[in-house]
Amino acid sequence: MAAANMEKGELMNQVKQQIALANAQEMLSKMTEKCFKKCIQKPGKSLDSTEQRCISQCMDRFMDAWNLVSRTYGNRLQREQYRTMESLEMTS
């Protein structure tokens, strides 16, 4: 029974890692698409300094927004989990 629980835990960790990787890949893809559309008017062999600066600032803002949303969502999940646990304790 303990071995089965350990395998289940390991499987859950692998699934969480795969989800995190998929989320990171999706974020990178969206960031690339949005910043490219915003900053690159005429694609060529290289980026000029204005395009480089725009890409850098766009990526920084995108990451800041992503981190803010992630923290806020994580905090909300924790609050809801805490409320659920309190509710369960009250009914016991």
From Swiss-Prot:
It is a peripheral membrane protein. Belongs to the small Tim family. The gene is Tim13. GO terms for biological process: protein insertion into mitochondrial inner membrane. GO terms for cellular component: mitochondrial inner membrane; mitochondrial intermembrane space; mitochondrial intermembrane space protein transporter complex. It comes from the Eukaryota. Signal peptide: none annotated. Keywords: Chaperone, Disulfide bond, Membrane, Metal-binding, Mitochondrion, Mitochondrion inner membrane, Protein transport, Translocation, Transport, Zinc. Gene3D superfamilies: Mitochondrial import inner membrane translocase subunit tim13 like domains. A motif (Twin CX3C motif) lies at residues 35-58. The keyword Lyase does not apply. This is Mitochondrial import inner membrane translocase subunit Tim13. InterPro entries: Tim10-like, Tim10-like_dom_sf. The twin CX3C motif contains 4 conserved Cys residues that form 2 disulfide bonds in the mitochondrial intermembrane space. However, during the transit of Tim13 from cytoplasm into mitochondrion, the Cys residues probably coordinate zinc, thereby preventing folding and allowing its transfer across mitochondrial outer membrane. Mitochondrial intermembrane chaperone that participates in the import and insertion of some multi-pass transmembrane proteins into the mitochondrial inner membrane. Also required for the transfer of beta-barrel precursors from the TOM complex to the sorting and assembly machinery (SAM complex) of the outer membrane. Acts as a chaperone-like protein that protects the hydrophobic precursors from aggregation and guide them through the mitochondrial intermembrane space. Disulfide bonds join C35-C58, C39-C54. It is found in: Mitochondrion inner membrane. GO terms for molecular function: metal ion binding; protein transporter activity. Heterohexamer; composed of 3 copies of Tim8 and 3 copies of Tim13, named soluble 70 kDa complex. Associates with the TIM22 complex, whose core is composed of Tim22.
